[in-house]
Amino acid sequence: MRILREGIAYSGKDTPKYSSCSFPSVCILSDGRLFASFKAAARKIPDNKTDHAIYCVSTDNAESWSDPIEPFEPPIVDGKPTTIRTLYFVEDTPDNLIAVINAVDATMEDLPYYNEETEGLKPTYILVSHSHDGGESWSELSRVQLDSYYDMPLPLTGAPFKAKDGRIVLQLETNKHYYETEYWVHHSVLAFSSDGGYTWGDEVTVTDNRDVYYWDQRASQLAGGEIADIFWTFDRRKGDYINIHFTKSTDAGRSFAELSDAGLVGQPGTVIDGGDGSLIVPYINRDASPEIRMARSTDGGKSWRDELVVYNFGRSIKEKQNAGMNDVWSEMGKFNVGHPFITRLLDGNLMVYYYSGPSTHRTDFCYAIIEE
């Protein structure tokens, strides 16, 4: 592997309201356009009152990017105003482009998104919209309710994707309500649509463990038909992270194999197929200076080895060893590099993208084009 070039899809350095960029995603449309979506805000933490969900478009394979587009006004949900936290796209067919957002209750806008006393989250909703003209216009946003986790805060963990059986897949995790005091059991969940993203259900709970949080799941469709799922993993008993864990489904996401230790330390992105039948994943290791690396597995995900350093931040930002959940959330709020993801461009090269910048509230949507 080698890096061919690096770039920035969007920098908010001259636009204060878009100064902090995070939650990056790239959707490649059938007409060759790239939609690079992300959260942009005046500040990263602690509240959500300045959040915007925007995207930029490239028509030349990530050589250049349009000015930012903000496609949706924050919706009213259950009679309450919201802010839009994240935006993702997936193309079902050329005439059915689906946008999926997370909207957050804005009536509590002065409060932190995460409640340190209860470990609950503000009300976080999933909504979808459809475009039949390639993103020129959009239908009204409609809320996704899941029977298994009705009315719970449901943060998305990455972009939706199309499974081999034609269903559209949402990836998310469950959280408890802001003031709920009961013990929180984290779940990573997939939900499915068989009608092009208009109705949702058939939820599959991928992880369910009282003591270990398999969170920030990154699920993806592999060429051979399997769905890969990989997790940033936190052991509540130890009060700190453990190795990344990995699993696969061979039945279109209806069930998953037992989780395995990937032997990698950090926060992963999505898994994609390598050109030689291997699997490739980007991940960020924050043990010292944050470093985005590429790892490869030649045995179907049983073991992984590092192959390339995509980006090194150049200085350590880890303040101390974590002691529990509140330390973890506090640390996440200060990150100014992270969320690495990967996609294969139409010319066969890889695009690894992530957010990075000089400070917590001043980060860009960055990427590297890599020859495998």
Where would I find each of the regions flagged by the language model?
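Asp-box/BNR beta-propeller blade signature and adjacent active/binding-site loops
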Residues: 1-372
